[in-house]
Amino acid sequence: MSDLFAKLMDQIEMPLDMRRSSAFSSADIIEVKVHSVSRLWEFHFAFAAVLPIATYRELHDRLIRTFEAADIKVTFDIQAAQVDYSDDLLQAYYQEAFEHAPCNSASFKSSFSKLKVTYEDDKLIIAAPGFVNNDHFRNSHLPNLVKQFEAFGFGTLTIDMVSDQEMTEHLTKDFVSSRQALVKKAVQDNLEAQKSLEAMMPPVEEATPAPKFDYKERAAKRQAGFEKATITPMIEIETEENRIVFEGMVFDVERKTTRTGRHIINFKMTDYTSSFALQKWAKDDEELRKFDMIAKGAWLRVQGNIETNPFTKSLTMNVQQVKEIVHHDRKDLMPEGQKRVELHAHTNMSTMDALPTVESLIDTAAKWGHKAVAITDHANVQSFPHGYHRARKAGIKAIFGLEANIVEDKVPISYDPVDMDLHEATYVVFDVETTGLSAMNNDLIQIAASKMFKGNIVEQFDEFIDPGHPLSAFTTELTGITDKHLQDAKPLVTVLKAFQDFCKDSILVAHNASFDVGFMNANYERHDLPKITQPVIDTLEFARNLYPEYKRHGLGPLTKRFQVSLDHHHMANYDAEATGRLLFIFLRDAREKHGIKNLLQLNTDLVAEDSYKKARIKHATIYVQNQVGLKNMFKLVSLSNIKYFEGVPRIPRTVLDAHREGLLLGTACSDGEVFDAVLTKGIDAAVDLAKYYDFIEIMPPAIYQPLVVRELIKDQAGIEQVIRDLIEVGKRANKPVLATGNVHYLEPEEEIYREIIVRSLGQGAMINRTIGRGEGAQPAPLPKAHFRTTNEMLDEFAFLGKDLAYQVVVENTQDFADRIEEVEVVKGDLYTPYIDKAEETVAELTYQKAFEIYGNPLPDIIDLRIEKELTSILGNGFAVIYLASQMLVNRSNERGYLVGSRGSVGSSFVATMIGITEVNPMPPHYVCPSCQHSEFITDGSVGSGYDLPNKPCPKCGTPYQKDGQDIPFETFLGFDGDKVPDIDLNFSGDDQPSAHLDVRDIFGDEYAFRAGTVGTVAEKTAYGFVKGYERDYGKFYRDAEVDRLAAGAAGVKRTTGQHPGGIVVIPNYMDVYDFTPVQYPADDVTASWQTTHFNFHDIDENVLKLDILGHDDPTMIRKLQDLSGIDPITIPADDPGVMALFSGTEILGVTPEQIGTPTGMLGIPEFGTNFVRGMVNETHPTTFAELLQLSGLSHGTDVWLGNAQDLIKEGIATLKTVIGCRDDIMVYLMHAGLEPKMAFTIMERVRKGLWLKISEEERNGYIDAMRENNVPDWYIESCGKIKYMFPKAHAAAYVLMALRVAYFKVHHPIMYYCAYFSIRAKAFELKTMSGGLDAVKARMEDITIKRKNNEATNVENDLFTTLEIVNEMLERGFKFGKLDLYKSDAIEFQIKGDTLIPPFIALEGLGENVAKQIVKARQEGEFLSKMELRKRGGASSTLVEKMDEMGILGNMPEDNQLSLFDDFF
């Protein structure tokens, strides 16, 4: 009995008498398979013989009971050295088989369990009645019985059935007589029951209820069966089945309510073998609450029937029973203080390579009790801000690092060069063929060389070498060398010595010489021969520097380009001769083009400054040790992305050296130079390289396993030897050796997600390596790169011995973590740029404008508001933000553009006064433009100053101006006025680039950066990756599994970008590296702006961010101003004609039937969408305040639908009184009598959708206060439904712009349509648009039908919107002209009387550049032919043909050639 087996017997308390029996004498545990997710342990035992049945049953029962107590399921099977086929033992085990699944099925057990068995002719024979000896039982059940006997220890046993005629007759006779007796008894029982019933039947009114069926007892029995039921792996279900039990994790839940009030819970579960869709019905709310455990992330046991869902056509479980189960996550079982620190972990910011968020990585480390964890994403630090915040919250040290791409600044062409005339030198051009890429683990099989002088081959060397083992198929395929070539080969040492003699007094030459020289030196060293010391020329680097314009510099492409023969590439003799021919071509060109004659000149005069771009990348891990190191890290990341980017961010070694203070370096993974040296050059070379680093990394053997498949390492023993060699390198170099995990995902079962992400990159991607060549290439396996606990890591390194494993896994990693100081990644304060006298300027501009409008002295209400705002703005250092925004708006205004405000900036009266926003947040009021007399309405009776009736100033008679939207300042900077202002501005799209450049001009190029963004894999994209993986790798997933895999693969960084309008301004007394690295968006080194490396949201509370967005409204207003000469500022906000648009179409001179809508909203910003048009139709707004309500209602979430809409329909509230914008809540509650602070807090809770999420005590406090102040219940209930609310200032700015546009639609229609089609229309179909009303209406009808059938394309949907406006324009009596070759503009619509002439870009397929070219060409002269239009105008044949079909070209001939008869007429 083995020690392990004995220990198990102690644990299950197996009786001593059974343990001492002969059957247990050599008992052993062959293998234990542990399935952590399903909590199933599979034991495989070895015994000397098949166990006595009593012993087997005892072993089975004790195993099950012991492990069941720990919530673990157990199965086991036995391998017996000797098998006893006695009838008694076989009969006992035969009956035992029916106690085990799947042989315990009711139909099989009832028919077979009592039958007799015998052993005859090496078969187990079952004597059975004839009616069960059929194909169904043979095919369905006998294979299960064979498997069960194999598990008992009988080996593979042949089982057969024979029909027993005597048994068949006896059973048939018994069945017939029993059936007759049963029928007779049933008839008799029925008659007696009926008589008894008639005799006992009571009067109707005293009817006695039937005996109650004990449902509770039945349910208890059913539940007990559910608890003990066999769990079916999801992957095994392929057809409809009943009473199936699953266990797994819920990853998606959706609850729906039917029209009848029933509820359905659609959810998806996975057990990580596959995934399944499930549904559970609940008849009412009470029953629904019983299934609250069905939630995302919950682990459940469910039972139900598998059926095909008629809607999804997928197998779906209709759940009958459900129970939440305990899921045991992996734990780090080492004692406190003896746990490792993970120092090499990637997050989802490692581009298309890793999965965990930095938060989940840190949470896992903290949960396991680790004192620290490192972040080492590939070449970026975008996880730092979130990691910094999460680590502080979790109470764990975050070690901030990255895995960098290190390159040499200049890659030499020549190694060990000497002063030598290249023309007079003798060269030995050589090549080696090997069994792999590792000089330490693979073998030389051929050395070939050509000795050359002045371009001529003077001697050749060619020797095969027997490696002592058969060649792999891959080696033979690659090199063409077979075992036959090696039969008579000389010993390796003999060949090495001969080659050294051959190479004397010459320059060595090889293509990719570092490989060949490294391989030779490793073999020289192994055989105590001197290593290469003479000069070496690498023709690969020679070609890269001599011909930088070539994309490929491999031997094959170069020989083709220079027409050098290479018949058998990858055989050393052919490769060497071809390389020699190329060498002398290179030498000639170097001499003629660059004047290079001496060997020393190759490195000094020819190696390019940017040769780092072609240098081989080596990975290194870099860690921030202190605050100085953090800034140096930011500088390195910036330089690698801005100055040294080539395919990936690169860090030249000298650049790293210059910024190494405060940083620590590790040797990284198998792509690091120290690991590579151990593999290819030997320990001595690795020791020299290791001196550059602060520690040596080793990783679990499983991480290096793909190197075995790629034939870089022979086997597991080879991996372990490499790890030992790395430890030896650390010992010799006096560097600590640390075990790291190279984490790319957290849990082992998440491996498939990374597999899908990596394979989506396609062959050729750096991390998606392949094995083999050409069509036969297969993807190399990815390593098992989950986050390992200390125990798991110690197990991985157990081959090192307990003490050494503990040292590298625990002690050294903890010591390293202790060297890391706490650093501040994200600043705690706001750092705004400095503008001289910003505070004085803001105050001066404010009062200057206020005095101009309201007079001096100011009205108290104005004076107090300004004082309140300036106290906050100036006191918190926000003046520079205001002033910067004012300068930008002012510059755009000077260029002739209005600037619209977004967000809550219009809540600030100071912002209004200094010109940042047009929105005036004061209460509605009158003010006289002549004498500055003013009147304020402060009781809330008027929603907007624009709605006040017109009246003259009572003092001077001048017509009053009206303004004021009643918006509290608190909604912008918070109740205490200390919230960082977020000033968003809508510039004209045409002027946006100029506004961006204004920021640079104001603050300086080195302080202004575009706000960076990070683009991750969206779930829809991930879905495509999963389907592609299915297709490419022959996988077949059910829909639920596809959904799970897509969700798992989503969220990984894919690219970077920039905010469309956000610009970050760094204070001019600091530099950008105090806050963030910088880079180019999407790695586009030609971009005109650099961006913040961090997502701008990560630092938006530390630096000034200006939102300079492009918008159509200011562009539209500028276009209308240019067309009309009307200053948009002078357009009244209460124009009766404009307001009439919201109640009908009469003002347009058309009927609703003509334009297909009951109001004039088509094409009006904010109000022209189908959704808002519907709201207008329901509410009929008549005031500016009501339009603000509509804007708020349409932009909010759960503010209109199911809320305000119902209140208005039921007559409970009106458009004026419902909650529309967030600010209205505070203003309304203050007018009702609540304290401002409470009114503000309620507004904040409601607008963020937190009303139902706060504590019941807090919410009830607010409700009581509102009811005490007579706030109606419907208002309170409405608050509880809201998820998000729109700021009133934003609504006011948008509505004001919309009304200005609407003004032109009413009063200057042709100009409006011209501006609309030039700026807002997204799709055109000129043939239809120029074809008249009938053509337009017919096309609209066509698209409408397609929409109903969900067949309309996006372009057709956009076209429908355009055609609605065309139809309206035509119905109003205007005309849509045809494209005119000589009158149409390139990009703008033209007005000719009552007709619009479309521009060239309106023609489908004709872009802006061609449009401008046509206009330019026609100015040079008339187009005499279609050929000339194509040639001078740049139009394609397709475009010319389309123009001709539309009648634009008239009778234009095909070409300019004159007819032979033209001269006669």
UniProtKB/Swiss-Prot annotation:
Membrane-traversing stretches: none
SMART domains per record: EXOIII, POLIIIAc
Keywords: Cytoplasm, DNA replication, DNA-directed DNA polymerase, Exonuclease, Hydrolase, Nuclease, Nucleotidyltransferase, Transferase
Gene Ontology cellular-component terms listed: cytoplasm
Group of enzyme by EC: transferase
Disulphides: none
Gene3D superfamilies: 1.10.150.870, 3.30.1900.20, 6.10.140.1510, Metal-dependent hydrolases, Nucleic acid-binding proteins, PolC, middle finger domain, Ribonuclease H-like superfamily/Ribonuclease H
Subcellular location(s) of the protein: Cytoplasm
GO annotation terms (biological process): DNA-templated DNA replication
MF terms (GO), sorted A to Z: 3'-5' exonuclease activity; DNA binding; DNA-directed DNA polymerase activity
Swiss-Prot/TrEMBL catalytic activity: DNA(n) + a 2'-deoxyribonucleoside 5'-triphosphate = DNA(n+1) + diphosphate
Domain Exonuclease: 427-583
KW rRNA-binding (keyword) present: no
Documented EC number(s): 2.7.7.7
Family from the record: Belongs to the DNA polymerase type-C family. PolC subfamily.
HAMAP family: DNApol_PolC
Entry function: Required for replicative DNA synthesis. This DNA polymerase also exhibits 3' to 5' exonuclease activity.
This protein's name: DNA polymerase III PolC-type
Gene designation per UniProt: polC
